[in-house]
Amino acid sequence: MKNRKIYPWIVVGLLWFVALLNYMDRQMLSTMKDAMQIDIIELQSATNFGRLMAVFLWIYGLMSPMAGIIADRVSRKWLIVGSLFVWSAVTYGMGYADTFNQIYWLRALMGVSEALYIPAGLSLIADWHQEKSRSLAVGIHMTGLYAGQAIGGFGATVAAAYSWHTTFHWFGIVGIVYALVLIIFLRENEEHARVIRAMHTDKSKKIPLFKGVTLLFGNIAFWIILFYFAAPSLPGWATKNWLPTCTLRISISLWLRQGLYPL
């Protein structure tokens, strides 16, 4: 398990599934909207559904820098385990929600917990891999995000076969169980652990937060990368959140025109 040649790839494999769950759990709500709005009538309003999507994204975006700061100062293993456990518990709890407000606040909590994962996960992978394999390792990990989006798209199919409550419950249980698996198999890089201990014992090695932020904002490369990721995210998230609803409405419209929609 601790073999230096094998274990870095085990880390990628372990975190690949976490990345899958990270994006799958957030995507399920948009695909199951039509099933959920039967029981929670507020979801029939596009405005209310937009609020659910927005609260997650605003909190996720605002928390991401804080998540990076936290990941630099604590054990990333336990940060990953904790965030996975919390957002999986939130997913499980959504299956018991029967009001819009309950879904809204659970969605907000999901934004906080899911934001904690990506900085810690990528940092842990970067620590376990050298320059020759680091980009490949990160690239493989990123495929987990897209696999999660794709699988989350089948939430409506599962909800139709069982119920949206059951769908949330089972996907939540999977994440909770996997968090326990990570406790056993995921390891922190010892070199990083030594740096963290040194920071706690030698205060002079700590970089003041304000100074670090100033250096970051003064780096032109930071702004280029920020714009590079922000530009496709604007239409990307609109598509992810609203495409299932738009597709359903267009399909129903076409069926009605052709007289094929089962009334």
Language-model features, listed with the residues they occupy:
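Helix-loop-helix hairpin linking two adjacent transmembrane segments in secondary transporters
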Residues: 141, 145-190
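Extracytoplasmic
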Residues: 10-44, 239-244
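Extracytoplasmic gate region of multi-pass secondary transporters
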Residues: 29-30, 219-263
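Conserved MFS/SLC helix-loop-helix module at the cytosolic interface between two early adjacent transmembrane helices
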Residues: 62-98
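Cytoplasmic helix-loop-helix junction between adjacent transmembrane helices
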Residues: 106-145
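Juxtamembrane intracellular "pre-TM" segments in multi-pass secondary transporters
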Residues: 2-4, 191-225, 249-250
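Residue-level signature of mid-helix packing/kink "hotspots" within the transmembrane helices
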Residues: 27, 57-65, 115, 149-150
